[in-house]
Amino acid sequence: MTTLNARPEAITFSAPQSALIVVDMQNAYASPGGYLDLAGFDVSATRPVIENIKTAVAAARAAGMLIIWFQNGWDDQYVEAGGPGSPNFHKSNALKTMRKRPELQGKLLAKGGWDYQLVDELVPEAGDIVLPKPRYSGFFNTPLDSLLRSRGIRHLVFTGIATNVCVESTLRDGFFLEYFGVVLEDATHQAGPEFAQKAALFNIETFFGWVSNVADFCDALNPPLARIA
């Protein structure tokens, strides 16, 4: 068993019965010229997040954890996004941006396009699972729950973008399904001002899960004394 230093208290889990979830590390959310950037959100601080996720993924993989990569988006005709009868049509900033700028139609979060692709630095490997998702939560209209339950996985460690949107939404839904959720705060980034990150982390550690960081996560999976030995 592994004990991870976290807030509000440490949490113990079995690495082989846990999953590291990488949420939406796509050009859309982490690269200049991607959807968030074009919609007016600041993506200038995402590079350290990418490096921290690389570190967390390597540690998790070495410890035998399942790695799950999410990609948020829809078909290039946006049928999966829902029409005016869906609240997603009205609240998705990607869809709103394309309505304001018709020249972007078919480019933002469209499967097969650059915006939808994972950033170059993060590459899934054999044995990882890559899941498309059509809404903020990774549990909505995806096989995530059955994939986890069939493997006996109950603990989920979250990284990715955006902390206050898709990361928090997926962790919250997991909480309602009896999963233990941990977020690595320095391997996430918010959409919006810094207070959005702080509020999301407050919600998670107070009501829905635990908050840790990449260094403590790596040390828990591979303690320094074990590395020296």
Swiss-Prot record:
<dbReference type="InterPro" id="IPR019916">
    <property type="entry name" value="RutB"/>
</dbReference>
<feature type="active site" description="Nucleophile">
    <location>
        <position position="166"/>
    </location>
</feature>
<dbReference type="GO" id="GO:0019740">
    <property type="term" value="P:nitrogen utilization"/>
</dbReference>
<comment type="similarity">
    <text>Belongs to the isochorismatase family. RutB subfamily.</text>
</comment>
<keyword id="KW-0378">Hydrolase</keyword>
<dbReference type="InterPro" id="IPR036380">
    <property type="entry name" value="Isochorismatase-like_sf"/>
</dbReference>
<dbReference type="Pfam" id="PF00857">
    <property type="entry name" value="Isochorismatase"/>
</dbReference>
<feature type="active site" description="Proton acceptor">
    <location>
        <position position="24"/>
    </location>
</feature>
<dbReference type="GO" id="GO:0006212">
    <property type="term" value="P:uracil catabolic process"/>
</dbReference>
<comment type="function">
    <text>Hydrolyzes ureidoacrylate to form aminoacrylate and carbamate. The carbamate hydrolyzes spontaneously, thereby releasing one of the nitrogen atoms of the pyrimidine ring as ammonia and one of its carbon atoms as CO2.</text>
</comment>
<dbReference type="GO" id="GO:0016811">
    <property type="term" value="F:hydrolase activity, acting on carbon-nitrogen (but not peptide) bonds, in linear amides"/>
</dbReference>
<protein>
    <recommendedName>
        <fullName>Ureidoacrylate amidohydrolase RutB</fullName>
        <ecNumber>3.5.1.110</ecNumber>
    </recommendedName>
</protein>
<dbReference type="InterPro" id="IPR000868">
    <property type="entry name" value="Isochorismatase-like_dom"/>
</dbReference>
<dbReference type="InterPro" id="IPR050272">
    <property type="entry name" value="Isochorismatase-like_hydrls"/>
</dbReference>
<feature type="active site">
    <location>
        <position position="133"/>
    </location>
</feature>
